[in-house]
């Protein structure tokens, strides 16, 4: 028997899945539905989502549409960039990092309207169900969570489309007149999954890409830019101070123009299976390269190496949905502490899909040209000191070698 629910807050995009879920919640639970649509910079008009919700019987006062772009970049993307976070060495976590913010705002709305449940449109095969629900429970331990994909019998795209058509819910088509790929988009990235991409041997067709030009078609002339950093966060491009969301938007424009940030990836989902996705992260790809460039100049070597050791664990926590966990917060505190003097300017070259650091400077630089020079260093470094350093580090290896020579 279905548990009684009076009012539910649905994370609503206005797309096919969440529109079907909205109708299903009304029919299956007989409850009042409140919709929440987050503007995370996905680049789509949000008003169609409002109109669609109204057409499906949602009261205007129960339709929430929030511009979260600045909060998204400032409080979620930038902290992650301070860590140089990459899941499995490649993925910039564009979908993963958006879910904690959506969950946070959903819970806030649920409290505001007196809802006793929240709902999402993530499937029972993916990571997003975990990310959303770990966020819900961390912020509202007693909230009821409705995950329709784990409850209903609409277990395929064809059944979902049939349900939609039977209830006059518009079924979107892509530019080829076909049902679209599974797409997630925000200010940091766009991901595409499903259909032909489910065969990992098939090359991603060019028509799938939406955020970047083909690198082969990018300008034949490189573009040189500078990014200014303060305490680990980017604050300006080419000397122009920008807000976090404005800065990432500008980097996205530059990355799009030069075909930067495409990634074809087979990844290990937390749920246990492998999946293949196509990611476009133009601005984020530029930003992480620039951040590493300024760290190379300003971060102590031991601190940098420790940070690099911690990064995979930090990235895994975000990927798996543990943004609100104490261990993520502990790692974040250490990472943020490391950024106290990570300030300065990085110069980069953008060209046909590549981004390369070609210069960096900082008032906090640990780089000493006087010490490292191949020319006369005027006594800044005594090369004879290296002999004792090497002997001490070789001691255990010499003892091991002596034992091996005895055949022991």
Swiss-Prot record:
Catalytic activity: L-citrulline + L-aspartate + ATP = 2-(N(omega)-L-arginino)succinate + AMP + diphosphate + H(+)
Main localisation: cytoplasm
Name of the molecule in the record: Argininosuccinate synthase
Sequence positions that bind L-aspartate: 123, 127-128
Protein family: Belongs to the argininosuccinate synthase family. Type 1 subfamily.
Keyword Ligase among UniProt keywords: yes
InterPro entries, alphabetized: Arginosuc_syn_C, Arginosuc_syn_N, Arginosuc_synth, Arginosuc_synth_CS, Arginosuc_synth_type_1_subfam, AS_cat/multimer_dom_body, Rossmann-like_a/b/a_fold
Localization per record: Cytoplasm
EC number: 6.3.4.5
Keywords, alphabetical: Amino-acid biosynthesis, Arginine biosynthesis, ATP-binding, Cytoplasm, Ligase, Nucleotide-binding
Oligomer and partners: Homotetramer.
A single BP term in Gene Ontology: argininosuccinate metabolic process
Pathway in which this enzyme or protein is active: Amino-acid biosynthesis; L-arginine biosynthesis; L-arginine from L-ornithine and carbamoyl phosphate: step 2/3
One Pfam family cited in the UniProt record for this chain: Arginosuc_synth
GO molecular function: argininosuccinate synthase activity; ATP binding
PROSITE patterns: ARGININOSUCCIN_SYN_1, ARGININOSUCCIN_SYN_2
Gene from which this protein is expressed: argG
GO cellular component terms attached to this protein's record: cytoplasm
Biological classification of the source: Bacteria, Pseudomonadati, Pseudomonadota, Alphaproteobacteria, Sphingomonadales
């Amino acid at each position: 028997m279905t548990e009684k629910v009076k009012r539910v807050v649905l994370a609503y995009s206005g797309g096919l899945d969440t529109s079907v879920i909205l109708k299903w919640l009304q029919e299956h639970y007989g409850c009042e539905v409140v919709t929440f649509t987050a503007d995370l910079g996905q680049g789509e008009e949000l008003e169609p989502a409002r109109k669609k919700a109204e057409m499906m019987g949602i009261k205007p006062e129960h339709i929430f549409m929030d511009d979260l772009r600045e909060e998204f970049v400032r409080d979620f993307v930038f902290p992650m960039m301070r860590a140089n976070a990459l899941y499995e060495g490649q993925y910039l976590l564009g979908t993963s990092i958006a879910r904690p913010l959506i969950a946070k705002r959903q819970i806030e709305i649920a409290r505001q309207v007196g809802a006793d449940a929240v709902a999402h449109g993530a499937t029972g095969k993916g990571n997003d169900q975990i990310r959303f629900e770990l966020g819900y429970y961390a912020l509202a331990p007693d909230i009821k969570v409705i995950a329709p994909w784990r409850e209903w019998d609409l277990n395929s795209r064809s059944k979902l489309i049939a349900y939609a058509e039977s209830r006059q819910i518009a079924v979107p088509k892509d530019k080829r007149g076909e049902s679209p790929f599974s797409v997630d988009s925000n200010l940091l990235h766009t991901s595409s999954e499903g259909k032909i991409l489910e065969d990992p041997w098939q090359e991603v067709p060019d028509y799938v890409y939406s955020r970047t030009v083909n690198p082969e078609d990018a300008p034949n002339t490189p573009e040189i830019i500078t990014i200014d950093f303060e305490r680990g966060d980017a604050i300006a491009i080419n000397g122009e101070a920008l807000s976090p969301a404005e800065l990432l938007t500008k980097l996205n424009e530059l990355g799009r123009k030069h075909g930067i940030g495409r990634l074809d990836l087979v990844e290990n989902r937390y749920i246990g299976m492998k999946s293949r996705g196509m990611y476009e992260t133009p601005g984020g790809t530029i930003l992480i390269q620039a951040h590493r460039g300024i760290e190379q100049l300003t971060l102590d070597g031991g601190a940098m190496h420790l940070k690099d050791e911690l990064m995979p664990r930090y990235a895994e926590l975000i990927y798996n949905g543990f943004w609100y966990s104490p261990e993520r917060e502990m790692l974040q505190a250490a990472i943020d502490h490391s950024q106290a003097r990570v300030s300065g300017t990085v110069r980069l070259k953008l060209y046909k899909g590549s981004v390369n650091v070609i210069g960096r400077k900082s008032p906090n630089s640990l780089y000493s040209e006087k010490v490292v020079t191949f020319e006369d260093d005027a006594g800044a470094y005594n090369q004879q000191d290296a002999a004792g350093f090497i002997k001490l580090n070789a001691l255990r290896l010499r003892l091991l070698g002596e034992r091996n020579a005895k055949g022991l």
